[in-house]
Amino acid sequence: MKVKNVKPYKRRSLELIEMAIDMTKNREYQLAREYTKLAITYSRKFRFKIPIEYKRSICRKCYVPLVIGLTERRRIKNKVVIRTCLLCGWVRRYELKRDSKEGKGIPPRHKNRQERTQ
């Protein structure tokens, strides 16, 4: 089934995720879990991507929004961010971004490298 207008579903999905984050802050984890499952179902059914900042804020095992201090623990070790869900124990690791000026596609032996990276 091809849906012509996906925008209302995408907007509703993002609203559901934001409501789920609010429910998590109020410690209503079951309701927050239902909201995030519904938002993910919308994105799969109507074929749109959930933005990465929302996608990374949801536990992939128990579908609870990750809020630092309530449902998530963050640690940084060796330039890697380690995120742990405090409800189910799910662990995810993300590399920290490198310095954006250094690797802009300029070879190390280029004659103007110093000028371009400053």
UniProtKB/Swiss-Prot annotation:
GO biological process annotation, one example: tRNA 5'-leader removal
GO cellular component: cytoplasm; ribonuclease P complex
Catalytic activity from the UniProt record: Endonucleolytic cleavage of RNA, removing 5'-extranucleotides from tRNA precursor
InterPro entries: RNP4, Rpr2/Snm1/Rpp21
Cofactor comment: Binds 1 zinc ion per subunit.
Superkingdom of the source species: Archaea
Pfam families with a match to the protein in the record: Rpr2
Chain positions recorded as Zn(2+) binding sites: C59, C62, C85, C88
Compartments in which it is found: Cytoplasm
Keywords of this entry: Cytoplasm, Endonuclease, Hydrolase, Metal-binding, Nuclease, tRNA processing, Zinc
E.C. designation(s): 3.1.26.5
Keyword Secreted: no
GO molecular function: ribonuclease P activity; zinc ion binding
Top EC group: hydrolase
Keyword Transferase: no
Disulfide bonds: none
Cofactor(s) the record lists: Zn(2+)
Function text: Part of ribonuclease P, a protein complex that generates mature tRNA molecules by cleaving their 5'-ends.
Family that this chain belongs to: Belongs to the eukaryotic/archaeal RNase P protein component 4 family.
Quaternary organization: Consists of a catalytic RNA component and at least 4-5 protein subunits.
Protein name, UniProt field: Ribonuclease P protein component 4
Organism annotation: Sulfolobus acidocaldarius (strain ATCC 33909 / DSM 639 / JCM 8929 / NBRC 15157 / NCIMB 11770)
Gene behind the chain: rnp4
